[in-house]
Swiss-Prot record:
It is found in: Membrane; Endoplasmic reticulum. The modification Phosphoserine is found at residue 37. It comes from Homo sapiens (Human). This is Trans-2,3-enoyl-CoA reductase-like. It is an enzyme of class 1 (oxidoreductase). The lineage of its organism: Eukaryota, Metazoa, Chordata, Craniata, Vertebrata.
């Protein structure tokens, strides 16, 4: 009996010990689970492991042929899809140093239009091999040089005629006849016009970094310089006759000339800067400046003001050479305005569908 009681007591003791051990284990498990839960919650949601992307850059092989002889000049390999025609010209020059980038014109086919420098290879490529034809455009000059030469010449030429140097006019006749005030006013207006052109070329206009053939510079200078010589010769001639309606005609036309010059300047400044949205692709919209309100009526007000200036100068001086020059400039600017107007219609039809190109309600 004593042994049985002793064995029962030992079994009870073992059971109590096992229960206590189980409780401690459960408590530890609960603590571990609670700690693990906090750790998971603090770590946030599970995120999938980002897949490693391997960028594949497409390369093109460009074959360049001579547009005249149709013979292959070179092959440019490993040209990326983001490369432009300008980049291709640079690589072409490295491969063939005699082909200067400013003198090279690249075409997709012989006789086709020359590709602009900003065009990307991806936009013209039909396969991994691109065929281009190279043409030597001859001696090239920058557009800035063209504009500066065009406008500096008339400014200096007119001043030479205004000074009435003896090799142009008869010295005795020049000394005997006094100049009419409109002669001085015409010189002032003419100088203001071309000084504005020069300053805008240097500080306002965003002139293209491209080049143009030398013959275009010669043709432009011949046109502007030749007409300036003809105009200045008549206005500054000792036998020049003033306008028919006297000071009233001169004053009104001079005021209108200055207004058009100011309007032209403000329009050019506005066109050279993006609008308030910072987007160059938006159609120019008028602002608080009254000179910009012409945008309500026409899509190219800079040409409108330019023609207005020359019409005013024609009325003020009342000379045939100025009238002919104004007529030719009006025809040329109307063509430019219609071309730009068509571009605006394609891009911003909702903005300018009721506007004219250059002359309100007419053209």
């Amino acid at each position: 009996m004593f042994k049985r009681h002793k064995s029962l007591a030992s079994e009870r003791k073992r059971a109590l010990l096992s229960q206590r051990a189980t409780r401690f284990i459960l408590k530890d498990d609960m603590r571990n689970f609670h700690f693990l839960s906090k750790l998971v919650l603090s770590a946030g949601p599970l995120r999938p492991t980002p897949a490693v992307k391997h960028s594949k850059t497409t390369h093109f092989e460009i074959e360049i042929f001579d547009a005249q002889t149709r013979k292959q000049i070179c092959i440019l390999d490993k040209v990326t899809q983001s490369s432009t025609i300008h980049d291709v010209k640079q690589k072409f020059h490295k491969a063939c140093p005699k082909w200067y980038p400013s003198r090279v014109g690249l075409q997709l086919e012989c006789g086709g239009p020359f590709l602009k420098d900003y065009i990307t290879i991806q936009s013209i490529a039909a396969s991994s091999i691109v065929t281009l034809y190279a043409t030597d455009l001859g001696q090239q000059v920058s557009w800035t040089t063209v504009f500066l030469a065009e406008y500096t010449g008339p400014l200096l030429i007119y001043l030479l005629f205004y000074l009435r140097i003896p090799c142009i006019y008869d010295g005795k006749e020049s000394a005997r006849r006094l100049r009419h005030p409109v002669v001085h006013l015409a010189c002032f207006c003419h100088c203001i016009h071309y000084i504005r052109y020069l300053l805008e070329t240097l500080f306002v206009h965003k002139v293209s970094a491209g080049h143009t053939p030398l013959k275009n510079l010669i043709m432009s200078c011949a046109f502007y310089w030749g007409f300036t010589s003809w105009i200045a010769y008549y206005i500054n001639h000792p036998l020049y006759t003033p306008p028919s309606f006297g000071n009233r005609q001169i004053t009104v036309s001079a005021i209108n000339f200055l207004i058009c010059e100011a309007g032209n300047h403000f329009i050019n400044v506005m066109l050279s800067h993006p609008n308030h949205t910072g987007n160059n692709a938006c159609f120019p919209s008028p602002n608080y400046n009254p000179f910009t309100w012409m945008f309500f009526l026409v899509s190219c007000p800079n040409y409108t003001y330019e023609i207005g200036s020359w019409i005013s100068f024609t009325v003020m001086t009342q000379t045939l050479p100025v009238g002919i020059f104004t007529l030719l400039m009006s025809i040329q600017m109307s063509l430019w305005a219609q071309k730009k107007h068509k571009i605006y219609l394609r891009k911003f039809n909702s903005y300018i569908h009721r506007k004219s190109a250059m002359i309100p309600f007419i053209l």
